[in-house]
């Protein structure tokens, strides 16, 4: 009876080993991703170009490597940002930047800044006025795709005329590999390919067991 159980135990042991190896691969990949995310200070340190709006600089399917530890994004720099309320990364170039000592478009119109200054005057706190005013004017940028005619104002969230460096940017592009990410685009545009890949992986596992 023990002799009859031996093959079953051997198969079970082999199956468990394969499951553990697969889990080890997944956990290692996850740890590497989290480590890279912490190192670059970016929630998505690697992204895929999804459109042709940055041609000829970047083509659809290019794999981009991001860095998000710079305090500013300079004009001409290519950045990746998320539109507020959406989870779609957009890769575009900075065409205007408003530093801490500059006025953003809204402040030029004298709307938001006047409200803050009036409230500060009512409180009669001069020191607080300077601090509040400095904190208000954070580093803001305006972006545009190289292959687009207009800037990204229409892409931003409703009522948003610029991007906030700290709140909206995923990172700045520091390197890329051409066309490598096109597989991701194919899988998202053709869901049936995911089923095919899963079937191939399952077949490989079965063949290895035999």
Curated annotation (Swiss-Prot):
BP GO annotations: signal peptide processing
Transmembrane segments: 22-38
Subcellular location: Endoplasmic reticulum membrane
InterPro entries xrefs: LexA/Signal_pep-like_sf, Pept_S26A_signal_pept_1_Ser-AS, Peptidase_S26, Peptidase_S26B
Subcellular location, principal: endoplasmic reticulum
Enzyme Commission no: 3.4.21.89
Keyword Membrane in annotation: yes
Active site: 53, 92, 152
Chain's role: Catalytic component of the signal peptidase complex (SPC) which catalyzes the cleavage of N-terminal signal sequences from nascent proteins as they are translocated into the lumen of the endoplasmic reticulum. Specifically cleaves N-terminal signal peptides that contain a hydrophobic alpha-helix (h-region) shorter than 18-20 amino acids.
NCBIfam families per record: sigpep_I_arch
Similarity section: Belongs to the peptidase S26B family.
Protein name as catalogued: Signal peptidase complex catalytic subunit SEC11
Taxonomic source organism: Coccidioides posadasii (strain C735)
Organism taxonomic ancestry: Eukaryota, Fungi, Dikarya, Ascomycota, Pezizomycotina
């Amino acid at each position: 009876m023990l002799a009859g159980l031996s093959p079953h135990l051997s198969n079970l042991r082999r199956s468990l080993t394969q499951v553990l190896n697969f889990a080890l691969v997944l956990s290692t990949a996850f740890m590497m991703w989290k480590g890279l995310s912490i190192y670059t200070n970016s929630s998505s340190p690697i992204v895929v170009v999804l459109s042709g709006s940055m041609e000829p600089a970047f083509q659809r399917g290019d794999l981009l490597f991001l860095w998000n530890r710079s305090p500013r994004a300079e004009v001409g720099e290519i950045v990746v940002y998320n539109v507020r309320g959406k989870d779609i990364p957009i890769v575009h170039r900075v065409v205007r930047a408003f530093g801490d000592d500059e006025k953003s478009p809204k402040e030029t119109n004298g709307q938001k800044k006047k409200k803050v200054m009036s409230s500060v005057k009512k409180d009669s706190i001069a020191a607080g006025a300077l601090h509040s005013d400095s904190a208000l004017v954070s580093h803001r940028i305006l972006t545009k795709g190289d292959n687009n005619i207009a800037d990204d104002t229409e892409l931003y969230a409703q009522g948003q005329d610029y991007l906030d460096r700290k709140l909206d940017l995923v990172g700045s592009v520091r390197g890329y590999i051409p066309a490598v990410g096109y597989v991701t685009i194919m899988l998202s545009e053709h869901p049936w390919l995911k089923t095919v890949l899963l079937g191939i992986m399952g077949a490989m596992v079965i063949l290895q067991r035999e």
